[in-house]
Amino acid sequence: MSKECLLVAISNQKGGVGKSALTVVLASYLHYEKDLNVAIIDCDSPQHSLVRMRERDKKAISASPYHQQLVEKQWERTQKKAYPIIGSTAEKAREAADKLAEKENLDIVFVDLPGTVQSTGVFRTIVNMDYVLTPSIPDLIVMQSTLSFATTVLDYAKSQKDVPLKDIIFFWNRLKKRSNTDVLKTYSQIMGELKLSVLDSTPVSYTHLTLPTSDLV
């Protein structure tokens, strides 16, 4: 690679926690607002929802003068084309990321992984990333699965000197007024006791819970 490229996986062992939406939001913000060169590798097969989303966007723009004008205005403001979104498998994600980073001279590659550890190559890909972002929701079953897998991965990474993975970073997502505050508070405390990295993503309506966070905030 002509410059160091950060590889970041978006992963959770349960679906429905907002992985794909988060991937698009992060990539778009860093690409268009922070002027970083980014790309997304969609490994969430077989649906590949992000690849399909990009194809739908292209068709919509081609068929709509209004959307064409929006794209032109965005280009005038940012002078940046749309970032690449390519499909791959979890097993081949690292290889695809390296090739893409070399070709596009990227700063960050986001890898959207399947929502199950049973998919071939997920564990291998995770430990070969620089960082893993893990959106979490206050659901007992989701959190049990999430923490079990994450601690296993981190223990493995610490025991292997040649593993690139530096950290798994958690944050709460999809919090609503009817969310289970007991689960939220309990698992926030557990993650603090385990010294896991947790971003402060708590809405104002939950600040009375005084949830523990890491020094990353």
Model features per residue range: what roles?
Residues 2-30:
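Walker A (P-loop) phosphate-binding motif
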Residues 5, 35, 106, 165-167:
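A general structural motif
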Residues 11-17, 32-110, 115-116:
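P-loop/Walker-type NTP enzyme "switch/lid" segment
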Residues 24, 28-32, 55, 127, ...:
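Short, well-ordered alpha-helices that flank and scaffold nucleotide-derived cofactor binding pockets
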Residues 33, 103, 128, 193-194, ...:
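Alpha-helix C-cap/termination motif
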Residues 114-201:
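Conserved catalytic-core segment of NTP-binding enzymes
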Residues 207-213:
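Conserved small/polar residues in nucleotide/adenosyl-binding loops
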Residues 215-217:
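Acidic, Ala/Val/Gly-enriched low-complexity intrinsically disordered segments
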